[in-house]
Amino acid sequence: MDKLIIKGGKKLSGEVTVSGSKNASLPVFVSTILAPAEHEFSNVPFLRDINTTIKVMEQLGAKIEGNGNVVRIDTRGIDKHEATYDLVKTMRASVLVLGPLLSRFGIARVSLPGGCAIGARPINLHLKGLAAMGADITLSHGYVEAKAKQLKGARINFDVSTVGGTEHLMMAAATAKGETILENAAREPEIVDLANVLIKMGARIDGAGTDTIRIDGVKELGPVTHRMMPDRIEAGTFMIAAAITGGDVKIRNMQLEHLDALVFKLQDAGVEIINKDNVVRVKGPKKVRSVNIKTRPYPGFPTDMQAQFMALMCLADGASVISENIFENRFMHVSELMRFGADITTEGNAATVKGVKKLSGAPVMATDLRASASLILAGLASDNTTEISRIYHLDRGYEFIEKKLAGLGADIERVQE
């Protein structure tokens, strides 16, 4: 198993290029099930979650070729309608194949993601939506089975904003009979990217990026060529890496408008951000100011940037309150940050971070994807050496992050434990 060794205290400088979006690529790949044809996607990141999605689709019968960051998917040979537990258990997003398989074959059987309590997770919103469109859904032995000769358009109002649910039902509705209206839909840029792909295939979709999406079902969809949008969470992570080290970094291939809430808070903290000629320059101050954040659905502050922002606030002047309003149990990085000498207390969904003068490198353990990133950031800004174990989480969502940081002057290397 690999670990990262970081010798902190170096100001980052230079240029870095953001990879394609993981969270956009996963549903886009799944959407090709709807269109028996050859498809081509560029700017695809090389990540573990991408490989898992590819394995799921190959298990269904798709032929997939990769060449660098270009992936070609031939879905004409898909002849199975079941996604088994051995693959789905490793990634919750795999459940998105249910709707497209149901649309194509009239039947689909997909394992529930590992540790997924139906009532507590938004997957119940996916199933309620498919049922509203006429699907007969049964749960047994850890599998969801759905049947429908023809999905029919419906008006669906989500109880809470759900990115996966919005993506799932938008795909299912693309070839349903009649009009589907999704109300209280999620507004994330990744949903807009998926809608653009479906529209290129021939779907009729209006309103993606707003809270009301209208889909007028068509009989069939065709092949598509598409360049994946940049990963806004990776971009945000590099912005904080520049800020926390007092560095000066230029970031290429990012869309700053997708990170308005983060940009506002970073500027509030004293970070200088300059957007010129599609290159974003981030200059960190000698000492950041404390800033309160509350995670919200897009366009609010992204929950996927909460852990990284907390790492920054560990060195701020003053105290900040960080409220997590999207997910439960998303403070698992707190105990590890405290090993660096951070002063953090939690109560319910709020963490109070009192800035300290310095952090000291420590052996720490990654608990999830974004928590892993927060530990790297803390390590970059720490005295001494930091060792981060269980970094396989990182490989789910960051493409070659240690190489990119090393290119900015960080003393960081991946070694085998």
From Swiss-Prot:
Keywords: Cell cycle, Cell division, Cell shape, Cell wall biogenesis/degradation, Cytoplasm, Peptidoglycan synthesis, Pyruvate, Transferase. Its EC number is 2.5.1.7. The keyword Transferase applies. UDP-N-acetyl-alpha-D-glucosamine binds at R92, D304, I326. It is found in: Cytoplasm. It holds the Pfam family EPSP_synthase. GO terms for biological process: cell division; cell wall organization; peptidoglycan biosynthetic process; regulation of cell shape; UDP-N-acetylgalactosamine biosynthetic process. It comes from the Bacteria. GO terms for cellular component: cytoplasm. Phosphoenolpyruvate binds at K22, N23. Cell wall formation. Adds enolpyruvyl to UDP-N-acetylglucosamine. This is UDP-N-acetylglucosamine 1-carboxyvinyltransferase. It comes from Geotalea daltonii (strain DSM 22248 / JCM 15807 / FRC-32).
